[in-house]
Amino acid sequence: EEKLPPHKWTKASEGLRLYPVDPAGRPVLESTGLLYAIAAAALDQPGDQLELLVFRRRDTQIVHVEVMAPRAISVNYVEVWPGGSVQRRRQVQPLRLAVRGLPVVDPAGKVRGDKNEDFELLGLSGNIELALDAETRTPLLLSGNAPVFGKVTLRLSEVHLN
């Protein structure tokens, strides 16, 4: 049915749904907006933390982000600039972040949704790790679990800069 126009769907609803987590004036992001919010946040030293609200299907979820201990990683990507490109192949000490979804709790204190329904970021769930370039905050690596494949690591291959 997803390819049909909405007026032909057999099950559709309209109306307001209360967020199970009260936003209390905080913005509610969609999951890919998290990457921008994390990159802009004051997360610099191991132990620095941040909690953000993320919209997930029909509810909101608190996402906990924490800076992990530093560890060098290998990078191999192309920086594309208006005047040309540069190959970056080296060891770097990125800003390593653990990204975890906390259980969704409704106003009555009851856990909502499927207990096995993890927070998901770009198709990855479980123990998600995000590595950002310490200076530019460019995402260098994202790892987590993917259905069928298990542990998956996505690495930056090309970045377009101005």
Set out the residue ranges of the language-model regions:
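Extracytoplasmic beta-rich ectodomain segments of secreted or membrane-anchored proteins
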Residues: 18-64
